[in-house]
A protein has these predicted regions:
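Short beta-strand->loop
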Residues: 77-120, 133
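A bilobed periplasmic-binding-protein/Venus flytrap-type ligand-binding module shared by bacterial periplasmic
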Residues: 124-137, 160-161
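Short, solvent-exposed loop/turn segments at the edges of secondary structure
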Residues: 8, 123-124
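A conserved helix-loop-strand patch within extracytoplasmic ligand-binding domains
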Residues: 1-16
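Extracytoplasmic/periplasmic, Sec-exported soluble proteins
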Residues: 14-18, 42-49, 118-120, 133, ...
Length: 200
């Protein structure tokens, strides 16, 4: 189904760039999941080429299995409808064991592979930070930052709007967000929300 045109006897998993650690992580995962004889861990060559491979597959109606991440503008495009594949749940002990093998392969090449463990990538959370002085001097801004939360899908959509529709205009993208979403109203006092809405 995901035939590798360079080796039609195998499928192709479009992976990371070979200089990125995720390329080697994906190689180990392919081996751990028993797919080493069935799929190649394909290096698309660059981040732009990875995006083009995904967008091209969707444009042509062709199947693709690939590594990717969010948030990105590509994932916000309405024509891109990716499904995250299920892997064993993230487990730190397993991940640490796998990373020992990943680092050996990075140092000594693919022949350094040895059976270990594999599971899904850990979802990362962003941490909001401010200096103590700034926080003490700007309680209203800190209250806003504490209340501010936005879903990954909305960030994807806004990034796509920024790249594809606003011409790279951050202010236009912010206005588009404010005009088309309402969750921001809970981040500010009601009178501030009313003033913002009246100015849109």
């Amino acid at each position: 189904l995901f035939k590798d045109p360079e080796d039609p006897s195998k499928g192709r998993i479009t992976s990371c760039i070979s200089g990125w650690t995720c390329y080697t992580i994906n190689l180990v995962k392919i081996m751990e999941y028993g797919l080493g004889d069935l799929y190649t861990n394909f290096d698309p060559g660059s981040g732009g080429a990875l995006d083009a491979a995904i967008a091209g597959a969707f444009a042509k109606g062709q199947p693709i299995v690939t590594y990717y991440w969010t948030p990105t503008s590509l994932m916000g495009k309405p024509e891109i409808d990716m499904v995250r594949l299920t892997e064993p749940a993230y487990d730190k002990a397993c991940w640490d064991k796998m990373m020992v093998v990943v680092n050996k392969i990075k140092a000594d090449g693919p022949d350094a592979y040895e059976p270990s463990c594999a599971n899904e990538y850990k979802d990362m959370a962003l941490t909001k930070l401010a200096t103590g002085k700034f926080a003490a001097d700007n309680a209203d801004i800190i209250a806003f930052a504490d209340a501010y939360t936005i879903t990954t899908s909305v960030v994807n959509n806004m990034l796509a709007y920024y790249v594809d529709e606003s011409g790279g205009d951050m202010e236009a993208t912010a206005m588009h967000y404010l005009e088309n979403h309402s969750e921001w109203e809970s981040w500010v006092p009601a009178d501030v929300a009313a003033k913002v809405k009246s100015s849109l």
